[in-house]
Every structure is written in structure tokens, then in C-alpha cells.
Amino acid sequence: MKPLDLNFICQTLDLPMPSENQPVSRIVTDSRDIQDGDVFFALAGERFDAHDFVEDVLAAGATAVIVSREDCAALKGALKVDDTLAALQKLAKAWR
């Protein structure tokens, strides 16, 4: 399997290319499980909205966070999409 990188994610999700491509270790949706090199998708659930934890995720070493809320979009490392769940599904389909 080819390695995953930030350029592939941005290209797949129709986002602007980053100034510097970076390898991605994992795709993560649990903010408690972040490691250096992860990309975090901030999903909104019935009880929690992961956007509330985006700053913590970035501080824990995430390479990038995929967000849909405007208040998170300005953070360094944030990539804004319309719908984070749809973006995660699109990335998964492209990666198969």
C-alpha cells in the first residue's frame, strides 16, 4: 500500500495544497488517541462534537485537522470542508 500524505488528502477532498507535504501516520476520529503525524477528522455526534477538542488535538501533535465549523477553520493545521463525515467517507473510498 502506498504511503498516505497530506497532498493526497487535500487533492482527494478538493482542498488547497499545503505549502509543505507531510506524511500521515494515521487517520483518527478519537481525540484521546492522537499521536504525532495523525490527521484528525472532527466528527459531530449525538453527545459530543469533536470540534470542541481540535485545539487539544493540534497540541498533541496532529499533522492536520479536518473541520467543518468556521470557528476552527482559522487554526493553524485546520483544513475546512463542508461536512467532515462526508469528507472522511470520500477519503476512505479514494484510499481503497
Residue map of PLM features:
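N-terminal leader/targeting and accessory segments in enzymes
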Residues: M1-K90
